[in-house]
Every structure is written in structure tokens, then in C-alpha cells.
A protein has these predicted regions:
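A cross-family kinase active-site recognition segment
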Residues: 117-172, 198
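Loop-centered beta-sheet repeat module
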Residues: 164-195, 202-203
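Active-site activation/catalytic loop segments of kinase-like enzymes and analogous catalytic loops
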Residues: 231-268, 283-301
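All-alpha amphipathic helical-bundle segments outside canonical DNA-binding/catalytic cores
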Residues: 270-282
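ATP/Mg2+ or Mg2+-diphosphate-binding catalytic cores
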Residues: 288-325
């Protein structure tokens, strides 16, 4: 799931818009005494670094099933996964305000991911460990993935927006992208009925949600859900380098993907069924997670790094046969 927030005005959750309070109000519900409007430390959503005694903490939005997410992440932490869990405060944490949940996490000091082979390997290893700790059923009552209802009209609209944004940036979009996306629409019911193995997962496993200490530390587990395992793997393949200043402005190379998988497979044995459906899954996750990203935000096409990443993703979508499991 992807969230873009224009703070103090609106939250954009894919194509839905809801009103939200200002930053001062958010901090005050946790008894942080602030008078001036805080500045987010993250450009795409409200993330506020504040002091709690001698400790630096972060206040951010979490999802509707906040308690489920916290139970899940506490389990991961107990298993030895480096993941943030709620700070113990004098008030409830997380808290709800006007139907929006917010949580206070510790601020984690560390280095940023830079695309080195050892960083890629350790990231893959971490995701494999996370998946290995999932139960066979949705024990933590996490949100269940159910996005199998895209239609051709949505693809047509999405492609119109993508082509328009690209033209303004002086870029031509390969028509093969639309062909692939329309084909993905036809595959949705096949995937829905495939009964692929599901896992509990943070489901937003990408570089900008990791801090290296030097091992990876997951600082944003708030999109946690119950999802087909290889859907989560495909999302990491596609968007691991999204919205990250230090990361390469492209998808993984084939060699890098194999390094990521080598770490992942230390804990996970993928099934033959997953390997059979992998090509369709890559296309479906692009349809669900990447198409709207390219179509929704014209300004990203004017940023050199995002523009290069988008073009890399398009080339990937047209021919990703060598990215195997």
C-alpha cells in the first residue's frame, strides 16, 4: 500500500482523500508540549522527530488496525528482528484522533542504504527471516490483500496520465507498457484463485524504510498485512529503490536481484507453484503498485532520479523474464 500525504491539508491514499489535523495537534495527543507547527523529517508523509526525556522519538501515522500491527511487530522483535515497536509513554500509544491512528516509535540512528552488494544481501536475508516467522493463518488479524479488481478503463486512464506526464518531461513511453498492463488485467482472477502461500509481512519493504546499524533495521512496519508471499517479494523487486536519495535510480540489476534472493532463501524455500505464477505476479504488482504511482504524481516525472527509476520500471515491465525466483 502506498501513501502520499500533503500535511495539514489532505491525505492521498491512492485515489481517496480525507482530511487530517495539523502537526501540533498530533504531538499534543501524546502529551508532547509543542506550540509551533513541527516540520516533517520525511518529504512524503508527516514524520516528526521529538524529544521524550533523553530519548529521540518519531511520531507518525499508522494504519487502521493499529493494535494488530503492534502485536505483529512485537512478535518480530521477540524473534530477533530489528524493527521499531511503540515507545512506552504516560499515555496510550498508539492513539486515534478523528479516525486516524498515530504511533510513537524510537528514532533509530544509522547509515542510509547505498546499494552495496552486502546491503542488498542483508536486506534480502531480513525479508526472508520476517516471512519465515509468519504463521500459516492470519493470526494477527492483519489487513488482507484483496486487490484483484482492476479493469481496462483504469489502465486506459492510467496510461493517458503517464503519457501526458512523460511528454511534459520530454520522454516517449513505449506502447508495449500498455499492452502488458492490459494483459495483467486478464490475469487477476487466475491469481486470485491460485491459492498462493500467504504471509504476515510489513509489505513496504524498501530502502527508505531501512536504517543500517550496520545490519538493517526496519523503521516503518505500518503497512503490515496478510498477502501472497511472492507479491511481497515482487514489490521489493520493483520499488526497493523508490524515493531514496542514496539508492540507485533504477530497479535491481539481475545480479543484484540474485544477491537479494540468496539472502532471502536462507530462511525460505519457495514452492514450484510460486515459480509458475511469478511472471504473472510481477505484472500484477506493477499494475497495483507502480501504475498509479507513475500516473498520480506529475511532479515526480520532473525529478531526475524518479524519472530514471520510472523508465527502468517500464523497461522491466516490458521484459523481466530474466528476473527469476
Amino acid at each position: 500500500m502506498n501513501i502520499y500525504i500533503q500535511f495539514s491539508v489532505e491525505i492521498f491514499y491512492k485515489h481517496k482523500v480525507v482530511k487530517v489535523m495539523n502537526g501540533t495537534q498530533i504531538l499534543n495527543i501524546f502529551d508532547f508540549d509543542v506550540e509551533e507547527e513541527p516540520v516533517s523529517i520525511y518529504p512524503y508523509s508527516p514524520v516528526y522527530r521529538v524529544k521524550y526525556g533523553d530519548q529521540d522519538v518519531v511520531v507518525k501515522r499508522t494504519q487502521s488496525r493499529a493494535e494488530s500491527v503492534m502485536s505483529y511487530t512485537n512478535m518480530l522483535k521477540d524473534k530477533g528482528i530489528n524493527v521499531v515497536t511503540p515507545v512506552k509513554l504516560q499515555v496510550d500509544n498508539p492513539q486515534k484522533y478523528e479516525d486516524i491512528n498515530f504511533v510513537v516509535y524510537p528514532f533509530i540512528e544509522g547509515e542510509k542504504y547505498s546499494g552495496k552488494d552486502n546491503e542488498i544481501y542483508e536486506a534480502g536475508k531480513m525479508l526472508g527471516q520476517i516471512h519465515s516467522y509468519s504463521h500459516v493463518s492470519n493470526e494477527y488479524n492483519l489487513l488482507e490483500y484483496d486487490v484483484y479488481d482492476f479493469n481496462k478503463e483504469e489502465v486506459e486512464e492510467g496510461m493517458e496520465a503517464i503519457i501526458l506526464h512523460a511528454e511534459k518531461a520530454g520522454i516517449r513511453i513505449d506502447p508495449g507498457l500498455k499492452t502488458k498492463l492490459l494483459g495483467s488485467v486478464a490475469n487477476q482472477q487466475v491469481l486470485y484463485h491460485a491459492e498462493l502461500p500467504h504471509v504476515a509481512t510489513p509489505h513496504d519493504f524498501k530502502a527508505n524504510n531501512l536504517v543500517l546499524i550496520p545490519d538493517p533495521y526496519l523503521i516503518d512496519p505500518d503497512n503490515a498485512g496478510w498477502i501472497p508471499r511472492i507479491f511481497d517479494l515482487a514489490l521489493a523487486l520493483l520499488l526497493f529503490h523508490n524515493e531514496h536519495e542514496e539508492a540507485p535510480d533504477r530497479v535491481f540489476t539481475i545480479d543484484e536481484w540474485e544477491i537479494f534472493l540468496s539472502g532471502y532463501k536462507e530462511s525460505i524455500v519457495l514452492t514450484n507453484q510460486e515459480k509458475v505464477f511469478w511472471e504473472k505476479v510481477k505484472q500484477h504488482v506493477f499494475l497495483d503498485e507502480v501504475m498509479w504511482l507513475m500516473a498520480e504524481y506529475e511532479e515526480d516525472w520532473q525529478k531526475s532520479s524518479q524519472q530514471k527509476l520510472f523508465m527502468s520500471l517500464i523497461h522491466f515491465m516490458i521484459d523481466s523474464a530474466n528476473y527469476r525466483l
